[in-house]
């Protein structure tokens, strides 16, 4: 587990607009090995596109129809030539337990492939664009 960040005032957290979105389509990013390009129904007429570094953990076709939690008010940015209009939230979890004969001081660090990434979602379907609070 990573070290916790310092506390922030509630006003800072209140500025983050978390919403539910439904994945309409997902495909490999044409210019990046680790990214998927997703089209989302976020409750707006135009929807949005988000690029997410989840290709290693998710098959694009398995994402279609899933509901995810997004940060809806991030400024759009270019990721390898594609616009990303938000961020999909996910948890990162180390795979497996440390070997019983491993170093006791935690000196051995797992590589980036030694983790799982799990998308945050809702336990039942809700309207796209619903606010998360």
Predicted regions and their residues:
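Phosphate-backbone binding interfaces of nucleic-acid-interacting proteins
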Residues: 1-133
């Amino acid at each position: 587990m990573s070290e916790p960040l310092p506390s922030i005032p509630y006003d800072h957290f209140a500025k983050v607009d978390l919403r539910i979105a439904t994945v309409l389509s997902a495909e490999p990013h044409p210019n990046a090995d680790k990214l998927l390009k997703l089209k989302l129904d976020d409750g707006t007429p135009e929807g949005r596109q988000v690029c997410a570094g989840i290709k290693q953990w998710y098959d694009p076709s398995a994402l279609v129809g899933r509901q995810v939690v997004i940060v809806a008010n991030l400024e759009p940015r270019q990721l390898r030539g594609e616009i990303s209009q938000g961020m999909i939230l996910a948890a990162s979890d180390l795979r497996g337990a440390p070997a019983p004969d491993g170093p006791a001081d935690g000196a051995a660090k797992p590589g980036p492939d030694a983790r799982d990434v799990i998308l945050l979602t809702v336990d039942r379907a809700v309207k796209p664009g619903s606010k998360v609070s």
